[in-house]
Regions:
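Nucleotide-activated donor-binding/catalytic signature segment of Leloir-type glycosyltransferases, i.e.
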Residues: 266-282
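Aromatic "clamp/platform" in nucleotide-sugar-dependent glycosyltransferases that forms part
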Residues: 303
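Conserved donor-binding/catalytic core segment of Leloir-type glycosyltransferases
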Residues: 210-231, 237-240
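Short alpha-helical donor nucleotide-sugar binding micro-motif in glycosyltransferases
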Residues: 99, 290-295
Length: 409
């Protein structure tokens, strides 16, 4: 990375997130806002463009008063097609007005509402930078599934194709090596990003006292993520059942997160008694970090994935990791040698990997050392500085350039 300082300017950021407001100001439930807000020190001003729920309320992640929120008309979700279409003219007017108050705009998608922001930004002669966090067709296929949602899958392919076409002309920030390759090939540069929500202070606090820690009895397993189909949380219970058959009472699983499969999972977990604990959604911060520090092994079982932020959190805590080898997981961990990787949808392989880690102290120590070193390289501050430099145009990174910065030497 060069030492040049990003040109100071006002940055607008659009990503599909609902904001709420009360007497304390704006807030949201989406953890990624922590990364967005980390860009604030690099610009003269930050303007968040997004829909605002008319119902007052407070969410876990507050937006500071120093950051402006440009409110768009509210709709329930991206599934609310009628609401989106009905409010489209008002949405375009609000976007146009917000773009008049910024010098550049980072448009994160692809979602239906992100394309108008990018097009209007170009029309207003602003510097437009795209952001891509997931493979949209793959996400829709796993998240929705079934013939009923075939039209949505078709729309996802069209939307991604349009976003990729636009990315040939404007700079793009892509999360993970796979998306960086997918969006490269045009005239514009692509920044390969590993998103981290773990600050330098977090790494220090999480890693403190983690070295040479032995596993407890029971061995504490931790999983953090949405309880939705594409995250395959049922694999956790299937693997635990196999482990219980071989070594009864040796393992205890804590599941952090909520989602559409939560009730089903709770019912299935009844047979394990106290060996499975559900914590619901725990916001990124001290309470979640306490759970990381109290655990022995981190388990990630998604069947499709971008570059999961929870891996950075687990590595910062010095937790050895077992994860499915999908999407950007291997690249997110480093070279793939920093964890045990298993095929998706394979509870036998998952159980075997967990048992191996639980019984091999030297392997856990190696993973712990590599993980903490990587977390220190990929802090929130460092990654936000890279994105700020890229958006400002002071750096032109090509796919693959990030590799030397993303792998501990």
């Amino acid at each position: 990375m060069s030492d040049s300082t990003p040109r100071r300017s006002r940055l607008g950021i659009y990503f599909e997130v609902p904001y709420r407001r009360d007497e304390g100001g704006f807030s949201t439930h989406v953890p990624f806002i922590r990364f967005v807000l980390a860009l604030r020190p690099h610009f003269d001003g930050l303007v968040l463009v997004g829909r605002v729920d008319p119902e007052p309320g407070r969410e876990p992640y507050a937006v500071p008063d120093s950051v402006e929120v440009a409110a768009l008309p509210h709709y329930a979700s991206l599934k609310d097609t009628i609401g989106i279409v009905g409010k489209f003219p008002a949405t375009l007017r609000a976007i146009w007005g917000a773009l008049g108050r910024v010098d550049a705009v980072w448009v994160i998608g692809p979602v239906p509402t992100s394309l108008p922001v990018a097009v209007l930004g170009l029309a207003r002669k602003k510097r437009v930078v795209l952001g891509v966090r997931r493979d949209l067709p793959r996400y829709v296929r796993h998240h929705l599934g079934g013939r009923r949602w075939a039209p949505a899958l078709g729309a996802a392919y069209v939307l991604e194709a349009l976003f990729r076409l636009l990315a040939r002309r404007v700079p793009t920030v892509a999360v993970g090596a796979d998306l960086a390759r997918l969006y490269s090939g045009g005239r514009a540069s692509v920044l390969e990003l590993a998103v981290s929500l773990v600050s330098e202070a977090d790494v220090h606090a999480l890693s403190k006292g983690s070295h040479n820690r032995d596993v407890g009895h029971p061995v504490e397993l931790l999983s953090v993520g949405r309880l939705d189909p594409e995250k395959a949380p049922e694999m956790l219970l299937k693997a635990l059942a196999l482990l219980e058959k071989r070594t009864p009472g040796r393992y205890r699983l804590t599941i952090v997160g909520d989602g559409q499969l939560e009730n089903q999972l709770r019912a299935e977990a009844d047979r394990f008694g106290d060996a499975v604990r559900f914590r619901g959604h725990v916001p990124n911060g001290p309470e979640l970090f306490k759970l990381y520090r109290a655990s022995d092994i981190f388990v990630h079982v998604a069947r499709t994935e971008g570059l999961p932020q929870v891996l950075s959190e687990a590595q910062a805590a010095g937790l050895p990791i077992v994860a499915t080898d999908v999407g950007g997981v291997r690249a997110g961990l480093g070279s793939g040698a920093e964890a045990l990787l298993v095929p998706p949808n394979d509870p036998e392989a998952l159980a075997a990997a967990i048992a191996r880690l639980a019984s091999d102290g030297d392997l856990r120590a190696d993973f712990r050392k590599l993980g903490i070193a990587r977390a220190r390289m990929l802090t929130l501050e460092r990654q936000a500085a890279r994105v700020a430099a890229f958006i400002s145009g002071s750096e032109a990174w090509e796919p693959g350039d990030a590799a030397e910065h993303l792998h501990p030497g």
